[in-house]
């Protein structure tokens, strides 16, 4: 598992951050809270949640980034609720 990614912020939108680390650009879905924290920064560190979906035609591997460990923990708690997901 990926615990966190630290690197240069290559691109930022309210829904996504791209972090370049060791020559690889990682696209991570982010919250508006994390977006606010990242604005104006060059070097960043995001705590990662990996979402792997298999078993159908649309298998996917998605990364979500959070500004703090606490925000990631809250997200992980929320997705345990039936009917709640990343979108």
Summary of predicted features, one role per range:
Residues 1-5:
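Short coil-to-beta-strand transition motifs
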Residues 7-9:
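Conserved hydrophobic positions within beta-strands
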Residues 11-87:
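Long, highly charged, low-complexity intrinsically disordered interaction regions
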């Amino acid at each position: 598992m990926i615990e966190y990614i630290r690197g240069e912020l290559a691109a930022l939108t309210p829904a996504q951050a791209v972090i370049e680390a060791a020559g690889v650009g990682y696209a991570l879905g982010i919250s508006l809270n994390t977006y606010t924290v990242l604005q104006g920064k060059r070097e960043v560190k995001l705590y990662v949640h990996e979402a792997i979906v298999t078993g159908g035609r649309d298998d996917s591997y998605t990364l979500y980034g959070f500004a703090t460990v606490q925000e990631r923990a809250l997200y992980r708690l929320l997705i345990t609720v039936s009917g709640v997901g990343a979108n």
